[in-house]
Swiss-Prot record:
The gene is E6. This is Protein E6. GO terms for biological process: DNA-templated transcription; regulation of DNA-templated transcription; symbiont-mediated perturbation of host apoptosis; symbiont-mediated perturbation of host ubiquitin-like protein modification; symbiont-mediated suppression of host innate immune response; symbiont-mediated suppression of host type I interferon-mediated signaling pathway. Signal peptide: none annotated. It comes from Human papillomavirus type 63. One of its GO terms (cellular component) is host cell nucleus. Gene3D superfamilies: E6 early regulatory protein. Keywords: Activator, DNA-binding, Early protein, Host cytoplasm, Host nucleus, Host-virus interaction, Inhibition of host innate immune response by virus, Metal-binding, Modulation of host cell apoptosis by virus, Transcription, Transcription regulation, Viral immunoevasion, Zinc, Zinc-finger. A zinc finger (unnamed) spans 27-63, 100-136. Plays a major role in the induction and maintenance of cellular transformation. E6 associates with host UBE3A/E6-AP ubiquitin-protein ligase and modulates its activity. Protects host keratinocytes from apoptosis by mediating the degradation of host BAK1. May also inhibit host immune response. Its main location: host cell.
Amino acid sequence: MDLTSVHSVRDLSSALRIPFIDLVVPCNFCLKFLTNAEKLLFDYFDLHLIWRDNFVFACCQCCARHVSLLEFMLYYQESFEVSEVEELLNQPLVNIGLRCVTCTKKLTVSEKLAVVSAGERVHKVRNKFKAKCSLCRLYII
């Protein structure tokens, strides 16, 4: 059975017929095992498992935040007003794939609308567009 096409922790749990809470998945960066809460957040954030030599890895919350910060510091390109991004890509913001600049979560439609209503800027990092999700917007970071 080829598991390398499995992208979520929940799907891996089902494919292996192991209860979700019993599945151990190491972080790709720090190699600590993800907690059950982190496994749930990994799937909720719509992140994908990493397969290397038939071993699976995910990303813990601490490392996700550190990677986001490093990626922003090293690969930041520029910031745009929402209208500029929509004009550049010729589509409304709700149709554009955005991830959180702080925690890597994929933004929902309501979070994208909150970015628009708050007049926040959208950042281009590594040729991908990023803004803050609703939870990270609560913190002044």
